[in-house]
Amino acid sequence: MAAGVTPSGTSNWQLRDSERIIRGNEGLLGRKHHLVAITRLRNEALILPDTLDYLGDHVDAIVAYDDASTDDSVDILRKHPKVALIVANQAWEKNVAARKLAEGRHRGLLLEMARAELPHDWMFCFDPDERVTGDLRGFVAGLSADACDAVRVRLFDAYITPDDCEPYRPDRALLDFRRYYGPEQRDILMLWRNRPEIGFAEGHGRTPGGMERVRTDLYCQHYGKSLSVDHWEETCDYYIRHFPFETYGRKWSERKCQAIHTLSDFMRPLYEWGDTLFANAVKI
């Protein structure tokens, strides 16, 4: 697959001159799989080894988009046995509008590549700082043919607290890393069947279109706010600089220097992971 052309069997998304395909474990290509995963990332070397090992227990193959990382993310991806293909971008777009459009384009490109090179029954779309709890592979295998087209997963943010503020280290698992979580529940579409009518169009972010029957199940821990105090500040700066101010920049400006929490960002009590958290969940 050369830059500037679509992978065979696809039609919507083209590689740009700044993007190149890196083949990982070629033994995964051209084989039928039950569950394949796609992800997009930038500078995730700190958590990426654990992310790939965690995903490797659940999925058959991974396709990744690296958005011009300046750390070792690409090398980590290339060496992992479950990573089949990588799109490595060399030119990161700083423009606010371009960043928003890139979310759907990158995932659309990955989805089409997976369909062309990794025939599969189900797709799992994840971010590196997310950990779905429970038996993901077993859950998908247990879905009957007429159960649903897609699955939304209940996601909760983990928080740094006064008695749990040590930074994440790469020698430990990210799953259950933090003790406390906010009750705000976001239902994120992460799983869908490999059907041609399901796909990404221009303007889509994380969620593709074309699903008719969607159920909500499973739970997910999100660590985007809780890896470390330094990472929190970097996250604030990223949203302030590269996303629309009214919808993202304003609230993240107000969160600067507020990494350690006693309440959630929405001023609600924090809970340990488990039934009490779920019973107090507030959909947002």
Question: Where do the PLM segments sit?
Answer:
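Phosphate- and divalent-cation-binding pockets in alpha/beta enzyme and binding domains
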Residues: I47, D72, I76
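Active-site-proximal specificity loops/subdomain of glycosyltransferases
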Residues: Q14-L29, D75-C125
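Gly/Ala-rich phosphate-binding loop of Rossmann-like dinucleotide-binding domains
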Residues: G56
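Catalytic-site signature of metal-activated, phosphate-bearing donor transferases
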Residues: A2-L29, K100-G108, T133-I284
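The conserved acidic donor/metal-binding loop of glycosyltransferases
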Residues: D127-R131
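Active-site beta-to-alpha loop of glycosyltransferases that engages the nucleotide-sugar donor
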Residues: K32-H34, T39-D53, A68
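Short beta-strand/loop segment that forms part of the nucleotide-sugar
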Residues: D60-D71
